[in-house]
Amino acid sequence: MTTPIIWSIAGLDSGGGAGLSADQRAADAMGVHLCPVAAAVTAQNSRAVEAVFPVPAEQLDAQLAALAQDLPPVVVKTGLLGGVAQLRVVTRWVDRLRERGPVALVVDPVLRASTGASFAGDELLQAYRDELLPRATVATPNRREADRLVGEGCPQQQSPLLGVQTVCITGGDAAGPLAQDWLHSPQASGWLALPWRAARNNHGTGCCFATALAAALAKGFVPADAAVLAKMLTTAGLLPDATPGAGAGPVRPAPGFITEAGLLPGLFDTPPARWPARPDGPPAIEGVYGIADSGAQAAELFDAGLTTVQLRLKRAAGESGAAWHTRLAAEVQPARDAARRHGATFIVNDHWRAALALGVDFVHLGQEDLLALDTTARADLAQARARGLRLGISSHSLWELARAVAWAPDYVACGPVWPTLTKAMPWRPQGLDNLAWWAAMSPVPVVGIGGVMVPEQMVRIAASGAAAGCVVRGLKELPVQDWLDAWRSGAGMPATPDPAWPHPSLGGA
């Protein structure tokens, strides 16, 4: 497999903390090839920036021309540019590269050093607004940079920044128990958060974040997934170690960050006040997880030995509310009664308010259901959870897994593991590698779902480390005992090694 190439056009930090030095560390941890292009040279140490010397425009142009002949990029990332002339060299080359094929542009608008030195006057700010940002795929300003670009007190949680489709406004330097970044993208919007880390080595966080995001785009991830990976890498590099100078030391991410479970962020609808607590007690589900399309089938599955069954019903077009609730109640009753007889777990899909009214205490919601919740419904669901309602959530991508984490559910479903005809969806199959990564990284149990047609597939799900495996159509074709035997066989096998990286489940940027 060819290693993706990205260009970073940024400043050279003589202290080795930020700029191209940070970009190189992030690119190495992400497993991409970085071409470091100097747009400015700085005289700085760990405490202060003493001077900035923009590289002459013709020298910057020569660097890019040389690279274009032999090392064309998948993604270009910009940092400190030094001046309007340098910015215009970049825009010209982005346009030339895009004439040859798709090239993403990640703009980290480095306008001020963390020590307070300003890198941009009014003319350069206007060039960002009028010339560079309109070409950007993603922009990653911090809160102060976003304010300078669009005006003080800008509504940062609103979309998008100066026409850029994906914006991630980083805010890890703000006080509070959580480090929160605002994400707006075509795939998802919300607050990416992780517990705040006290670290002296925090010089170059913005550079690392932007480069990691660029690298993730180069590896084929869509922007929302790329932002999740960038959050993970940057947090991993915040270390409490001794610093090489008197000021802040450099962020130092390592390749192993991708399998550190504590680095998976949550994606919250509103700014969170605290990190969500995990559900207490043993796993809510384990083993073979059946999905039935009627209450009678669900009851039969419980009687045949399944300990977890979900009832998946859809409201018919034109069906009135009263008729729907009557039908739902009639379908729920036999399944609920059978579950109680066997001490089993009965789950209702989607219809959480109706399920509660019918005495069901476990519901499953898809991502579209979560997005459809208004402020009142989110509050009501949270209150129901506090009173004991158990919850499972679907996920098909990194950002959906992060959104699920924010709800602290009882389990997360990962799918489709294999291609499925049960319902149309845009997602690529996750495969057993992504399922194993989900199982290793998720703070709650993971269920493998999608395309399970023969017992051997259930064996492989069990061996992946997942807590349970879903089967739908296969329950009508083979006896329940065949599926139970398959689960036991897989659960007794040596665990599948954790994959080094997940693969993208949607097409890239």
Task: Locate the predicted segments by residue.
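Short, small-residue alpha-helix embedded
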Residues: 26, 148, 199-223
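Glycine-rich phosphate-binding active-site loops on the catalytic face of alpha/beta enzymes
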Residues: 35-43, 312-315, 366-376, 413-426, ...
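Conserved phosphate/ATP/ADP-binding segment of small-molecule kinases
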Residues: 118-189, 326-407
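Short glycine/threonine-rich catalytic loop with a Thr-x-Gly-x-Asp
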Residues: 13-17, 194-213, 449-450
